Amino acid sequence: MISGELKPDQGVVMLLDRRVNHLSEIARVHRGCIRSFQVSSIIGSMTVFENILLAVKQKRSILKMLFRKFQSISSESSFVYQILNQLSLKTMETKVASTLSHGDKRKLELAMALAMGPKILLLDEPFAGLDQAESSKLIELLKSIKKIMPIFLIEHDMQAVFALADKISVLNEGEIIESGSVEKIRKSKLVQNAYLGGDL
């Protein structure tokens, strides 16, 4: 609902302290609400650099607040290089996206989302299909990003959620069954019974 894909039956949707019920999905993107979907948005025939550049051109606005250490951004290309460096993708810039490992494709999707200048980042199952090593790297990357902007994370990997979240809401069959801190969710019998049938 926060992205505008679904409309609420009642109540108010707030985005960065502003009511956005009346705004379209595109309008919310321009307000800085950027989504990364479980289904890849990468164009496989394009290089890593080209995919990120395309995302920059889609947004057509560069937010310096993403990378505070840089004083100025002279062009779209230089912004792409900043993102490549930030996400440790510089050595892969000329690689065709279809040849990347699953973990590197997830990083590229994240880079493309960041290239659109988000003020809030919505991530849908970013850990899907990752092995333990890839998940660990992505967790550390997202920890650094959450220092810059809020992240809304939809994820079934509870260990990743516990490593990243400040507040968790757990859904079961479309209903919120528990909400609170990591510690509260770990101890919740409702969550344990719904998902694992035992301790988290």
Q: What are these regions, as identified by a protein language model?
A:
Residues 1-200:
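Glycine-rich phosphate-binding loops of nucleotide-dependent enzymes
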